[in-house]
Amino acid sequence: VEKMSKVLNFTRKDFEREQNLGKGLILVDFSANWCGPCKMLEKVLNNLSGRVDYRIARINVDEESELASELKIKSLPSMMILKDGEIIERLTGFMEDDEIEKIVKKVRKRESNTNE
């Protein structure tokens, strides 16, 4: 059975659409095929995507190098958390799923406090 939530492959167009129209939380992973830690993170995110209630997307920085430099992605892997199209958190380096979940929880808490 195909899990509903799998990691989405994003292009620049998808990312811009997300910034303009995005609702809710999305974790965007910037990675490259030649990057070892990215490959490890890919597995973690694939695993995570099946059991979290937010979307996860991946952007290949070799295919979207212009976007990556505009967003000042300096090292790989890098992740961003967007809420309603706004970048609210940037993460760098490989992380295990529990670390990622902890950060998402923290970000959600922080965001819900700022909106009241």
Predicted regions and their residues:
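Structural micro-motif
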Residues: 71-80
